Amino acid sequence: MSIEQLAETAQAMVAPGKGIIAIDESTSTIAKRFASVGIENIEENRRAYRELLLTTPKLSDYISGAILFDETIRQKTKDGVPFAEYMTAHGIIPGIKVDKGAQPLAGMPGELVTEGLDGLRARLEEYYTLGARFAKWRAVINIGEDIPSGTCIEANSHALARYAALCQEQGLVPMVEPEVIMDGSHDIETCYEVTEATLRSLFGALYEQNVVLEGTILKASMVISGKSCEEQASIEEVAESTVMCLKSTVPAILPGIVFLSGGQTDEQSTAHLNEMHQLGNLPWPLSFSYGRAMQQAALKLWAKDMTGNFAKAQQVIYERAKENGLAALGKWKG
């Protein structure tokens, strides 16, 4: 795929008023979500749930793409249409999570590095033939006493850059996700410092690996107070700090930035995104790539009656997509 085609896909992913739904939970993660609402974690239930999400009527009004898990990209609708094929036909770009998860970084207590580079070229080639046009790799950066270390940040940046270069070689837009974790008692200033250092390292590594930024999307965490911090930053403070941090680290040539919800409530994640757009003068589109913050209310409703509430749960998904789509334009009213 040419640079022009990668850039075209990346731009479509951050089209005005549209975002990306993350439904790439691993089998173990979806097991926890299902258990919390009393759904049995079997393949057919996982398939049916993904069908509920992906076949929501008019979803493409506010959703440009969806990040899938390996199992999901191989599954079909109840009518026998592969999910990726269904999505493409309905204006939603198929994406695929390709990392193998974060593992302890040897010699660095409390720190993690994401694995999955071995054999990645062949996996990306297969995912492209299955219909994927973008991929996602998540790095995990914890904040704690004397962490993160520069070593941890550099190791994750290097892996993200190698992944991104392989994606572009195989015709997929790389979504790079260096998540600074919300857990902890740190204040918003500490989160800013860590996020800034992480993003500076990441874009340096992308440059060194000859990754074309015009065909790359950043999935960023917001600059926010730690969950157990006594003083929680306001919506305005989160928006201002996040935009300031991004402006100081992210090249303007990047097609766009989407945010992860990272454990924020549904309303917080929408309100923060909306507030960023009130600041104006943004060098790139800012949108969303939410998982739990898009799905949780619909999952609870569906669990009560998996047949009878199917359409009602889809309506909830559509409404959440609409709220976030409006927030991505700065037009959400709360």
Curated annotation (Swiss-Prot):
Q: From the UniProt record, list the reaction(s) this protein catalyses.
A: beta-D-fructose 1,6-bisphosphate = D-glyceraldehyde 3-phosphate + dihydroxyacetone phosphate
EC category: lyase
Q: Which GO terms describe its molecular function?
A: fructose-bisphosphate aldolase activity
Q: Which UniProt keywords apply?
A: Glycolysis, Lyase
GO terms (BP aspect): glycolytic process
InterPro entries xref list: Aldolase_I_AS, Aldolase_TIM, FBA_I
Question: What PROSITE patterns does the entry give?
Answer: ALDOLASE_CLASS_I
Quote the SUPFAM superfamilies the UniProt record gives. Answer: Aldolase
The protein's annotated pathway: Carbohydrate degradation; glycolysis; D-glyceraldehyde 3-phosphate and glycerone phosphate from D-glucose: step 4/4
Q: Where are the transmembrane segments?
A: none
State the protein's name. Answer: Probable fructose-bisphosphate aldolase class 1
Q: Which organism is it from?
A: Xanthomonas axonopodis pv. citri (strain 306)
